[in-house]
Amino acid sequence: MKTCLRCRKDYPQNVAGNMLSTLRKEQNQLTSVLTGIHILRRTRLKNWLGEMLEARIIQPSISPYSSPVLLVQKKDGGWPTARGLPSLLQAHGTRQVPNSRDRGTVG
């Protein structure tokens, strides 16, 4: 069932997987609360995101259709190139999202 949630009070208090979403009504922007992350890692993540914003590696979006991107720092301390879903699908030559379970790995 599709539901259009127009303001914060319409959101359920507990969503499956403990991911709480909020709608910033004034900006029409969906955001996800960082849950399940230790407070020290959360602080580091916020600092890294702040640094990447300042360096213009990433940019904020107020589009209701934007997708979140997860960046994982490489072992050498660098950051991978973030690619959008269309270019990822084109690189794999498929219209389906690649899945780690398809390769027989645990994920």
Swiss-Prot record:
InterPro entries: DNA/RNA_pol_sf
Region span, Disordered: 83-107
Note: A stretch of 270 kb of the mitochondrial genome is duplicated within the centromere of chromosome 2 resulting in the duplication of the gene. The expression of the duplicated gene (At2g07682) is not demonstrated.
Major subcellular site: mitochondrion
Keywords assigned by UniProt, alphabetized: Mitochondrion
Protein name (Swiss-Prot/TrEMBL): Uncharacterized mitochondrial protein AtMg00850
CC terms in the record's Gene Ontology section: mitochondrion
Cell compartments where the protein resides: Mitochondrion
Keyword Mitochondrion attached: yes
